[in-house]
Amino acid sequence: MMPFRPSRRALLAAAPLLALPLGSGRAIAAGSDFNSFLAGLRRDALAQGIRPGTVDLAFRYIQFLPKVIELDQRQPDHVLTFAEFITKVVNPQRIEDARRNAGENWGLLQRVHQRYGVQPRFIVALWGVESDFGKTQGSYSVPAALATLAYEGRRGPMFRGELMSALKILDQGHIRADGMLGSWAGAMGQCQFMPSTFLSYAVDFDGDGRRDIWKDRADVFGSIANYLARLGWRGNESWGREVAVPGNFDTRLSGLESRRPLGDWMRLGVRSVGAPLTGREAADASLLLPDGLGGRALLVFDNFRATMRWNKSVKFAASVGMIADGIERG
């Protein structure tokens, strides 16, 4: 996954760019330097054993995308506080949508849970945060976006590797080149996997021979659960709780690096917002103050850390947990 950017989906909605073959009259003409760069990419792909036919077809959809560079370099006008972000993302409509989607897919979610040990509510919550339950997957040609970022982006070598991974996905027949669409940064499908993440963690849950995270919900849910399980998810635990801390709380005790038993936190004056804290929830927890003392506070467990291995953002991980809680209360 790419680092979480709260405005990413808004940017995608405001500036969609459909994949077009280079032969199209609407295609952006690439300069000679970019064409030379593509020749090197082609050699690399063939050297890695990707079939020439796959490379030829994929490169028909590769063009330089100036908008991708603009988005990569854009600085947000306003970085949302934790409280602002949670209010925006964990809203009543998203909770309602999450409950409805959980109910509509409950049988499939239970089968995924039995195989991977990840609770259905967390699968649905992650699906909702990543792609609004599959509705916002991005409309950029992934090969074109990755080639553009490899050529002129801030992390060229990384994106070059991601492009090679994307070509391997095409070579394995999981998706057609004209259907490999995603975000401007190359995150794909309903779970927004980068190509390298796809190769490592996407699964063919329904056994049809393809790992289809674009249209097949069985593969989407299975891939989300497999990834979380591989990241250390504990199926008998939750993610954390929103809590209240006293006004004189020592903030030096907060942070993911500080772990204490729940009893210790309670003796320090930490209190749950909602149901009381119990020793059943987890052996150790960390206290987070994303907006500082006086803002919202979280007591988080190991599953929160697993979610942050998916995406290194406290806001992201907390939103997943809170939406999952909303499903459970439904």
Model-identified regions with their sequence ranges:
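Surface-exposed patches in mature extracellular/periplasmic domains of secreted proteins
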Residues: 50-59, 119-125, 178-181, 211, ...
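An acidic, Gly/Ser/Thr/Pro-rich helix-cap/linker signature
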Residues: 30-104, 113
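Non-transmembrane alpha-helical segments in soluble domains
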Residues: 42, 167, 225-229, 321
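N-terminal export signals
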Residues: 2-5, 10-29
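C-terminal soluble interaction/assembly domains
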Residues: 249-330
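Flexible, glycine-rich surface segments
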Residues: 177, 184-189, 194-277
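A contiguous strand-loop segment
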Residues: 37, 44-47, 52-61, 157-181, ...
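Acidic/His-rich structured neighborhood in mature extracellular/periplasmic domains
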Residues: 87-216, 221-223
